[in-house]
C-alpha cells in the first residue's frame, strides 16, 4: 500500500477543499480494499450521492469517506444532525472511512468504523449556524469516536504503518454479529465493550465489571437489572470469541 497522494491530479485546481476531496478519494480508490472481504479496488458511487462514496462490488458493503489534514482526533465532522439520527435509527448507514494525512500529503491514519458501531450516543449535535451564515440555522453533527469501543475502530493504516489486511478483515468480521441485534440490544453490547476498554491490562474479573454498574444505570435508566445484563453481555462476547472465560469469574481480552 503506497501512502503518498498523486499530486499531479490537482495541479490545475485552486480550491483547497476540491484538492483534498480529489486526492483522498483517488487514494482510497487506488490503494484501499474492502475491509469485509478484502476485495480490491473499491468502486466509486456517482458524484454527489447523499449517503456513501464507495462500495464493494463483491460483498456490497458501502463506505462514506471523511478526511482531514493534520492529526487524528476523536471528533469527526459529519452532515445534518437530523438526517444522521434518522439514518442511525433506521439502520441504513454506510460504514465510515476516516483518513488523516500530513502536510507532505501522505496518509498517516486510515480507519474504518463499521456502521453497526454508530449509535445515537456517538452522534453529537452541533450549534445552529449563525443568522448571518449562508445556511442560517442549519444544525450539523459530529461523530464522537470516544463513544465507540476499540473493536469498532479498525485501522488499515495507523501512525503511518500499514496493517496486515488479513487482521483487518478478521477484526471487521468479528463485529458483524451486532447487525442482527436491535438498536437497543446493540447499545448494551457496545457499552459493555466500552467498559472492558477502560480496564487496564488483558485480564479482568466479573467484579471489575460490576464497578461500572452505576455508570450503566445512568445510561440505561429504565433497567433495574444491571448486573444481570452485564453477565448476559459477557456471555455474548464469550460466544463471539471477543473475550475468553478463564473460570471463577475471570476473563481475558482477545
Swiss-Prot record:
Catalytic reaction(s) noted: Endonucleolytic cleavage of DNA to give specific double-stranded fragments with terminal 5'-phosphates
Keyword Transcription: no
Class of the enzyme per the UniProt entry, highest EC level: hydrolase
CDD domains named among the record's database cross-references: DpnI-like (cd22319)
Protein origin, superkingdom: Bacteria
Pfam families: DpnI, DpnI_C
EC number(s) stated in the UniProt entry for this protein: 3.1.21.4
Molecular function as annotated in GO: type II site-specific deoxyribonuclease activity
InterPro entries linked: DRP, DRP_C, DRP_PD-(D/E)XK_dom, WH-like_DNA-bd_sf
Keywords: Endonuclease, Hydrolase, Nuclease, Restriction system
Keyword match Nuclease: yes
GO annotation (BP), single: DNA restriction-modification system
Family as reported in the entry's similarity comment: Belongs to the DpnI type II restriction endonuclease family.
Record protein name field: Type II methyl-directed restriction enzyme DpnI
Gene coding for it: dpnC
Amino acid at each position: 500500500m503506497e501512502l503518498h497522494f498523486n499530486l499531479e491530479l490537482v495541479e490545475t485546481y485552486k480550491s483547497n477543499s476540491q484538492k483534498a476531496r480529489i486526492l483522498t478519494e483517488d487514494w482510497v480508490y487506488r490503494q484501499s480494499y474492502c475491509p469485509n472481504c478484502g476485495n480490491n479496488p473499491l468502486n466509486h458511487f456517482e458524484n454527489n450521492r447523499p449517503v456513501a462514496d464507495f462500495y464493494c462490488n463483491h460483498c456490497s458493503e458501502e463506505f462514506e469517506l471523511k478526511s482531514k489534514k493534520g492529526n487524528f482526533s476523536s471528533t469527526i465532522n459529519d452532515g445534518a444532525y437530523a438526517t444522521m439520527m434518522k439514518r442511525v435509527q433506521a439502520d441504513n448507514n454506510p460504514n465510515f472511512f476516516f483518513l488523516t494525512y500530513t502536510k507532505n500529503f501522505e496518509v498517516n491514519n486510515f480507519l474504518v468504523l463499521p456502521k453497526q458501531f454508530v449509535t445515537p450516543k456517538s452522534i453529537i449535535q452541533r450549534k445552529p449556524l449563525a443568522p448571518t451564515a449562508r445556511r442560517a440555522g442549519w444544525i450539523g453533527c459530529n461523530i464522537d469516536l470516544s463513544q465507540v469501543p476499540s473493536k469498532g475502530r479498525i485501522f488499515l493504516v495507523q501512525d503511518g504503518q500499514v496493517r496486515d489486511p488479513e487482521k483487518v478483515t478478521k477484526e471487521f468480521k468479528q463485529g458483524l454479529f451486532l447487525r442482527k441485534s436491535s438498536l437497543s440490544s446493540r447499545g448494551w453490547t457496545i457499552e459493555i465493550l466500552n467498559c472492558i476498554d477502560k480496564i487496564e491490562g488483558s485480564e479482568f474479573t466479573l467484579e471489575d465489571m460490576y464497578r461500572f454498574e452505576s455508570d450503566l444505570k445512568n445510561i440505561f435508566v429504565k433497567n433495574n437489572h444491571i448486573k444481570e445484563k452485564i453477565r448476559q453481555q459477557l456471555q455474548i462476547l464469550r460466544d463471539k470469541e471477543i473475550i475468553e472465560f478463564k473460570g471463577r469469574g475471570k476473563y481475558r481480552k482477545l
